[in-house]
């Protein structure tokens, strides 16, 4: 999409309103990296945005693959963990929201 009054500019909407941002970080996840090693829960949610590579989110007994330039909101009350899903490094932004 190109926003109004922009030229030679392309954008991809990653997410809309998701809550209040608590904090954020850039993660560099190496081959076979991720965590935590056991699924966990908490009160806040995670918004993950993959900028390089590919991430695999384990959600209870299912998994979700997040490709480069995609985002996914993980509800904190659902048991989850996050892992690199490629043979190289995955880089992603994690934003904690409530």
Question: Predicted segment positions?
Answer:
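A short, N-terminal "cap"/entry segment at the start of jelly-roll beta-barrel domains
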Residues: 1-23
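Conserved short histidine dyad/triad with adjacent acidic residue
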Residues: 12, 26-42
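Short histidine-centered beta-strand/loop micro-motifs
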Residues: 16-18, 36-42, 83-85
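A generic "binding-loop/recognition-motif" signal
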Residues: 35, 43-44, 62, 78-79, ...
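Histidine-centered metal-chelating micro-motifs
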Residues: 36-37, 56, 72, 76-81
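Glycine- and acidic-residue-biased ligand/ion/polar-headgroup-sensing regions
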Residues: 44-55
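Short acidic-glycine-tyrosine-enriched beta hairpin
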Residues: 61-76
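Ligand-binding loop in jelly-roll beta-barrel domains
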Residues: 76-98
């Amino acid at each position: 999409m190109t926003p109004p009054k922009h030229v030679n500019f392309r954008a991809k909407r990653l997410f809309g309103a998701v809550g209040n941002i608590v904090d954020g970080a850039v993660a560099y996840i190496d081959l076979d990296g991720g965590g935590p090693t056991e699924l966990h829960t908490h009160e806040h949610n995670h918004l993950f945005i993959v900028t390089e590579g590919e991430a695999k989110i384990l959600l209870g007994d299912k998994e979700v693959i997040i490709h480069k330039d995609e985002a996914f909101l993980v509800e904190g009350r659902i048991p989850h963990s996050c892992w690199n899903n490629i043979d190289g490094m995955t880089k992603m932004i994690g934003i904690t929201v409530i």
